[in-house]
Amino acid sequence: MLITETFHDVQTSYGTTLRIYVYSPKIAGYPQAKFPGVILYSEIYQVTGPVRRFGQRIASEGYVVVAPAIYHNFMGPEALPYDVQGTDIGNEYKIKKPLESYDEDNKLCCDLLFQLPQFDGKRIGSTGMCLGGHLAFRALLDKRVTCATCFFPTDIHSRTLGLGQNDNSLERVSKELGNNQEMVLIFGTADTHVDPQGRDLIRKTLRDHGVKFTFLEILAAQHAFIRDEFSKGRFDSAITQSCLGFLFEQFNRKLRIDLGEFVDDNTPLEHVC
């Protein structure tokens, strides 16, 4: 499926301009075609080449993808380089940006989708990697977001996102998710940013609160395994392709199909071989 690319500059309550990149499917002969929406959150480097290609990949499957440049509080929409200086700047901004500003970014992305003529006006999914995985997780606090696929989300277990480094993402998401919302969380067992104890904390908290989720720990996969350049030796194409299967299964089921109202079926499952 062909795609088109553009961007929208949106004013925030912080007196800044949020640039939101838009990747849309294009089907020859069907200029009025409409598609579900996806919010794509980047790493600490803003919308880099790997993030852009990830957005294009999702759009090519028939989704309108919006990708915000999240550091509008401090800089323009340009991407930070994958070097020491870019990493230091990205990590600095990550904990200087108010949590409320992250949430406003998410609201503005949802609002923009509903203004786009190619959006079907129904359901939205979210995804992202690293910092973006956390933001995709937190995006579920907006009930317009039906599902999320979060790649190696950082800082959820440590509660260190945003100004003051004291976020409430895990607590709020685990308590506030609706029956029609769900998520996929994907980590590598060799991820040095989210240790086994941190992964266990996330999984147990979600399970204890009855959240609908899939939790993957991929043997030997490292942090940033989805980044197809400047990954510092961690990119794994085969694992990335496998994980996209989970993403598209969730998006196709939750965003494309009209499931109707949720009905809680407590019928015990039959124990069969």
From Swiss-Prot:
Q: Which Pfam families match?
A: DLH
Name of the top EC class for this enzyme:
hydrolase
* Keyword Hydrolase among record annotations: yes
Tell me the keywords, alphabetical order: Hydrolase
Enzyme Commission code(s) on record: 3.1.1.45
Which cysteine-cysteine pairs are annotated as disulfide bonds in the entry?
none
A cellular-component GO term for this protein = mitochondrion
Q: Where is the active site?
A: 130, 191, 223
GO MF terms, alphabetically ordered: carboxymethylenebutenolidase activity
Gene3D superfamilies under this entry? alpha/beta hydrolase (3.40.50.1820)
The organism's place on the tree of life at top rank:
Eukaryota
According to UniProt, the reaction catalysed is: 2-(5-oxo-2,5-dihydrofuran-2-ylidene)acetate + H2O = 4-oxohex-2-enedioate + H(+)
* Family the entry assigns: Belongs to the dienelactone hydrolase family.
Name under which the protein is recorded: Putative carboxymethylenebutenolidase
Q: Which organism is it from?
A: Saccharomyces cerevisiae (strain ATCC 204508 / S288c)
